[in-house]
């Protein structure tokens, strides 16, 4: 960005991360570019194991962009690139050969981890659920089994078990167990979103990313989804982007507040909502801007 007010040096920040030994995903010093236009500035994000981390901030602040870096979805678009590091259990999943070159140009002293070139494995280990439900035009069963068939060689009996278990974990099994052959598109919006969660869970990810998953859902469906996420964090780490401050306060353990492509404040959710340290976080949480 060209306006100097948008740079890290001009923004008051407060970062209180969890203990390093408890992290299973960590973004470090990320910059992100759409062509020559920079949209993220030296952003770091620690994700603690078996916790829910929320990202909040005004529209366009970089929340969804950060989420898409974490499992390399941006790599589908050649004009987009990230510079920095993303560590999954200590292994760098961001630094492929192209990124390594950019890091060295920036002056970072890093080596190449082979995992960075295996995007398929990365996306199996870090699942993603989008804002709008995206069921595939196939049966409920095949929706859940799709990723498993793509990544693993499983028997039909094993697939049956995985599909049932994933639907149970997504709190959807009781609603669909008698119509697994019906189209996933026949489900309600809330059910479709939980189907997408089940599809992501089927490949046994370590981390689940969710980009405003309840924005199009009614209050009842939102409550069901939140209950599901609270149960799921027993088995994996969750990062959720939300514009709903009450939702972040209800379900997250840690919250990061972003503004103009910067991580302004990061700490425990209770601490951020009760005693925000930065002026911009206080103003956002009290509704002075959005």
From Swiss-Prot:
GO terms for biological process: phosphate ion transmembrane transport. GO terms for cellular component: plasma membrane. It is a peripheral membrane protein. InterPro entries: AAA+_ATPase, ABC_transporter-like_ATP-bd, ABC_transporter-like_CS, P-loop_NTPase, PstB-like. Its main location: membrane. It is found in: Cell inner membrane. This is Phosphate import ATP-binding protein PstB. The lineage of its organism: Bacteria, Pseudomonadati, Pseudomonadota, Alphaproteobacteria, Sphingomonadales. The gene is pstB.
């Amino acid at each position: 960005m060209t306006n100097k007010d948008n740079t890290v040096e001009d923004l008051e920040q407060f970062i209180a991360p969890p203990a390093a030994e408890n992290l299973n995903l960590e973004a470090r010093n990320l910059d992100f570019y759409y062509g020559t236009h920079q949209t993220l500035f030296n952003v770091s994000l620690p994700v603690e194991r078996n916790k829910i981390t929320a990202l909040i901030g005004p529209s366009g602040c970089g929340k969804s962009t950060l989420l898409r870096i974490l499992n390399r979805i941006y790599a589908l678009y050649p004009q987009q690139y990230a510079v920095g590091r993303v560590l999954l259990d200590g292994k760098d999943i961001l630094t492929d050969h192209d990124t390594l070159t950019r890091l060295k140009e920036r002056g970072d002293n890093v080596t190449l981890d082979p995992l960075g070139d295996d995007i398929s494995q990365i996306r199996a280990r870090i699942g993603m659920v989008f804002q709008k439900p995206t069921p595939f035009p196939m049966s409920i069963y095949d929706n859940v089994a799709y990723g498993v068939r793509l990544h693993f060689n499983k028997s039909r009996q094993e697939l049956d078990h995985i599909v049932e278990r994933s639907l149970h974990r997504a709190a959807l099994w009781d609603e669909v167990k008698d119509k697994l052959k019906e189209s996933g598109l026949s489900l309600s919006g809330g059910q479709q979103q939980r189907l997408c969660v089940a599809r992501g869970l089927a490949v046994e990810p370590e981390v689940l990313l969710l980009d405003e998953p309840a924005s199009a859902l009614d209050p009842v469906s939102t409550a069901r989804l939140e209950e599901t996420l609270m149960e799921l964090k027993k088995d994996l780490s969750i990062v959720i982007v939300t514009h709903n401050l009450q939702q972040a306060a209800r379900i997250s353990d840690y919250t990061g507040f972003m503004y103009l492509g910067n991580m302004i404040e990061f700490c425990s959710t209770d601490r951020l909502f009760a005693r925000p340290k930065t002026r911009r976080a206080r103003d956002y949480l009290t509704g002075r801007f959005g």
